[in-house]
Amino acid sequence: TFTEQKNTYPLSADGSKYVVNGFIPFSPMIDESIYANALLWTIKNVCSAQRDGITEVSIPAKSFSCNLVLTSQADAKQKNTYYCTAQFQVKDGKLVYYLSNIQIESSVVIMKKVTPMEKLQPEKKPSHQETMDDFVQIESQMLNKLFDFVSTNQLSPITHWNEINIGKPVKGMTEDECL
């Protein structure tokens, strides 16, 4: 599995911004199954309330965006909360991901301080490099869990894409379709 292999997805520069981007092929799965599994996992694991945090869903484009909130692990040296925008799109048997607008919330004495990832200077300050490494570890764990779910979850057939697109449950939908 992706989780067992501990795959990591590093930060890279996109212009002046730090992002995490790439794609994972899921052949021989069909695009609709990849998309449905990715969206279902995100709804169940990322959103605190039903679809809360998902900012855009386009079934025709097989894409969705959400606001991610990731927290340093309990045993980590860092004690940060990370906020970012995640965009996913399925195309030609691949799940494309793009994490951007990465913000770090750290505790400074009794206050919380929010800093854009771009403000960090890892070449000058080792603590900044540790923060970046912490973020990569956490987002990589999240992506690995998502990719494992996409590759292993057996979906019941999804036949109500139009209703899902407008968020309207109808009689005959499966539980997964209603999410």
Residue ranges, per PLM feature:
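Ser/Thr-rich, low-complexity intrinsically disordered terminal regions
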Residues: 1-157
